[in-house]
Amino acid sequence: MAKKKALIPLLYLASIVFLPWWISLSFTKSLESWVTDWWDTGQSEILLNAIQEKSILKKFIELEELFLLDEMIKEYPETHLEKLRIGIYNETIQLIKMHNEDCIYTILHFSTNIICFVILSSYSILGNEELVILNSWVQEFLYNLSDTIKAFSILLLTDLCIGFHSPHGWELMIGSVYKDFGFAHYEQIISGLVSTFPVILDTILKYWIFRYLNRVSPSLVVIYHSMND
């Protein structure tokens, strides 16, 4: 009976780990055709207006340069100019298709992640008892560690999250989240988040050490500051 009670939280933990992957895969496959049909049938006007977005505008600037080139080479035979116009037209159609696919990708992945978040939130609420057991296991494990190991672990995590080399890791992580939600890569937004998150985490860490660790384990704080210096 005790083994069965211990197994249930472990199974719950495994389901928490693999459930997001399964939800994302299943809903992406099931919603893909529906989102594609909805966008293709009802969003053509929005698509033609949205084509002026910054990511697509660069391509059309290139096409405009080709038109200028067309004016400069009017002495070429008419067949050559006709091929040039056809090439520009085909390139324009291809850009519209690419932007159309990007919009579908964004809607599909954003919807899938929202559904995944709602399901996981409900699953966590329903599994509150298992979460309490897992939390007690974690607290017991941390309590049995020595202050030196705890200080080393805190120092390692802080260096990884807010250390000198952490911005590159944050950039990769935030870029991955952006891609997972289907958003385009905006360098300015990502740079702003990368420069903000470590500062916020550093402030939270210092407040946590001051308010919590000083009261619970003063010796741990002393060891941490000694190792950090």
UniProtKB/Swiss-Prot annotation:
GO terms for biological process: potassium ion transport. The keyword Transmembrane helix applies. It is found in: Plastid, Chloroplast inner membrane. It is a multi-pass membrane protein. Coiled coil: none annotated. The chain crosses the membrane at residues 7-27, 114-134, 154-174, 189-209. It comes from the Eukaryota. It catalyses: K(+)(in) + H(+)(out) = K(+)(out) + H(+)(in). One of its GO terms (cellular component) is chloroplast inner membrane. Its main location: plastid. One of its GO terms (molecular function) is proton transmembrane transporter activity. Keywords: Antiport, Chloroplast, Hydrogen ion transport, Ion transport, Membrane, Plastid, Plastid inner membrane, Potassium, Potassium transport, Transmembrane, Transmembrane helix, Transport. PANTHER family: CHLOROPLAST ENVELOPE MEMBRANE PROTEIN, CHLOROPLAST ENVELOPE MEMBRANE PROTEIN-RELATED. Belongs to the CemA family. Contributes to K(+)/H(+) antiport activity by supporting proton efflux to control proton extrusion and homeostasis in chloroplasts in a light-dependent manner to modulate photosynthesis. Prevents excessive induction of non-photochemical quenching (NPQ) under continuous-light conditions. Indirectly promotes efficient inorganic carbon uptake into chloroplasts. This is Potassium/proton antiporter CemA. It comes from Fagus sylvatica (Beechnut). The lineage of its organism: Eukaryota, Viridiplantae, Streptophyta, Embryophyta, Tracheophyta. The gene is cemA.
